[in-house]
Amino acid sequence: MKMRYVLLGLVLMAPLWVMAEEQEGAPGRTIEDLFLSQDIELQILRSQALGTDPEMKRLALRSIRAMVEQGVTSDGVFVVLEALASEGVSRQVRSQGAIVNNFPLIRREATELLGQVGGERAKNTLLRVLRDDPEVVVLAEAAYALGSIGLNQNNEVSDYLVHTLLRENARSTPDNNLAYSIVISLERLSEANGGLANPEVINALIETASSPYIRTVRMRAVDAIVNMRDHGR
């Protein structure tokens, strides 16, 4: 898995949580709706994703990764990815009161694949992940994936990322990987959109550069500030 932790070595203020509408024309199907599908491969993916065995979920993700790499995806495949990205968070399975499908590494991989699929719907799903997921490993992947997609209409994505970064900066022991992923994504969004209009982006990066992160993160924030000043010129 291409997780960004290797880059480091060890390596949400305002009411931002009103989600954007689903992509115009996108069917609002759920993974349960796929039971009606006549596509055998899709039925297999659904069964693997809905089970409580993490190995079956990994098999589903392996198949989806192969499809994504071949450029072959469908609405049904996307629905499966959405479900896996919220596995154990918004979609919970309980046994005797305990959640039995809380698999952060499954959510992380599904989140990574959503970034590769791209588009408005993937962006919206990733914003929900960034809002709801309690695991920093998943949040870091979601932040990185949002930068890879590059969409930032009305500063929606950059506002989410800045909110998350400022929250992390305020912690006594902030997570280096999450901050590093957000810094990279803000820079990518700036480059893809000819700069970022929200002045809070630079302020958040300046704060990051002086927060208790490892030197790699602090210097990356400084580099991002320098590079982003050129994007709007």
Regions found by a protein language model. Name each.
Residues 28-48, 70-96, 119-131, 151-168, ...:
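Amphipathic alpha-helical scaffolding segments comprising HEAT/armadillo-like alpha-solenoid repeats
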Residues 133-134, 211-215:
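Short coil/turn segments at helix-helix junctions and helix-capping linkers
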Residues 8-15:
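Bacterial N-terminal signal peptides
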Residues 1-7:
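Bacterial N-terminal signal peptides that target proteins for export
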Residues 18-22:
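Boundary at the C-terminal end of the N-terminal hydrophobic targeting segment
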Residues 41-61:
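Long, acidic/serine-threonine-rich intrinsically disordered regions with weak helical/coil propensity
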Residues 25-35, 55-72, 96-100, 104-119, ...:
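Structural detector for internal amphipathic alpha-helices that build alpha-solenoid repeat scaffolds
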